[in-house]
UniProtKB/Swiss-Prot annotation:
This is Phosphatidylinositol 4-phosphate 5-kinase type-1 alpha. Highest expression in brain. Also detected in skeletal muscle, testis, brain and lung. Its EC number is 2.7.1.68. The gene is Pip5k1a. GO terms for molecular function: 1-phosphatidylinositol-4-phosphate 5-kinase activity; ATP binding; kinase binding. Disruption phenotype: Survive to adulthood, but bred poorly and display reduced fertility. Failed to form any vessel occlusion after chemical-induced carotid injury. Platelets have defective aggregation. Bone marrow-derived macrophages are defective in actin polymerization during phagocytosis. PIP5K1A and PIP5K1C double mutant mice are embryonic lethal.
Amino acid sequence: MASASSGPAAAGFSSLDAGAPAGTAAASGIKRATVSEGPSASVMPVKKIGHRSVDSSGETTYKKTTSSALKGAIQLGITHTVGSLSTKPERDVLMQDFYVVESIFFPSEGSNLTPAHHYNDFRFKTYAPVAFRYFRELFGIRPDDYLYSLCSEPLIELSNSGASGSLFYVSSDDEFIIKTVQHKEAEFLQKLLPGYYMNLNQNPRTLLPKFYGLYCVQAGGKNIRIVVMNNLLPRSVKMHMKYDLKGSTYKRRASQKEREKTLPTFKDLDFLQDIPDGLFLDADMYSALCKTLQRDCLVLQSFKIMDYSLLMSIHNMDHAQREPTSNDTQYSADTRRPAPQKALYSTAMESIQGEARRGGTVETEDHMGGIPARNNKGERLLLYIGIIDILQSYRFVKKLEHSWKALVHDGDTVSVHRPGFYAERFQRFMCNTVFKKIPLKPSPTKKFRSGPSFSRRSGPSGNSCTSQLMASGEHRAQVTTKAEVEPDVHLGRPDVLPQTPPLEEISEGSPVPGPSFSPVVGQPLQILNLSSTLEKLDVAESEFTH
């Protein structure tokens, strides 16, 4: 029978740690007799990272459970828990809802609550089902769409799992990512849920991960914890570059092994080398992105979270137009029924559009969820970004890690840092180095109330403000006399001694502006004659001194 329990987070996860009772069917694990519990002598693993290993036949195993069996257990468990939850009346989320753990046993022969299946017996646990139902509703995900995306077709395993050794699955419609997480990360997420709930209520538009469910598959005395999140990188869009950025420089370069992959994940030092000028966004988009990053970092800092990254994939639209189209690699959507409703605020563009709307202009062109940008070559880009790896708190282990690293290296360059400093450095790197505002071009028709003063210098080169006159495109054309002199007159009044440059700074080699236009009569002004100007200055000086 399905059972539910509630209690503190630690108590909730203590049930996760307990293995299946000895002698029960669950102790035999998910794998059938045709699959060995561990690597056999004939099939030895050729690659192992953390709990994840791949044998010579290409079969992935996680905690002695094959990937195919794990995918089947996940789909059976989610189908049951979402279906049973739909029969319960909707209500407001209560505090105790964040600590509820529901458990259901799946014997291979089936039961009055579960269907028969061809895997070994396993137990499936669901954490905070009512709270996560609210999160899914907040993002516009209906129960039938959630089930259809995750359970109608086999999950697709992603080979590029990263250095953590986690398993990654993506739903067949590209909507959701399923990731295996460690016990401490799952425990931290459960403790984080009340604050996460409050933050999403205040602002659902965020670059933070969007969590849709937290589950555990218990088999063979092992607990495999998984989290369902939004998918940042659609497979329907070809990515040309991918970066994992922290704002740190210590060991922040992709390894040679990583570079050999089809789409390597580069790091901070690689970005500084590949794109030293940064990525250029229009003013409204840049402002919206930086405000979103600032708000998200403040939330992470309040929870003492650090060591997170900005995952950024770049689609080069100009390169894509020149590349031959391959039907084999192009993603084709499932056409058996209309595409399910997309999760709200699930793309990078949607995550920052709330800020862009407050600022005024919003990019309305369809960019497939990416943020439009350009590189220093002027090539059109689409950026797919999101903050990842937030389930790390600044605990004793991290403090100790930073302490010994700081003794050997510059403390400011180490990625494991106190949350406040980490957030500040992260924002500074993203908004000053990675993303930059496209400089506005000066408009030749823009009018100013008054031009710059004639006495101002343009720089160390000694150019007079006549060069500034040409840049502003405006200057009052007036012929003045001694009787018309006013103390506050600026340009066009060479008879005002305090505002004239020293004579020794003016040379015949000084640049002279081209024709400008008078805002009064709209006629071209005559090019200034430097010799005539000097003569007028001499006359004015003699008149004021006598």
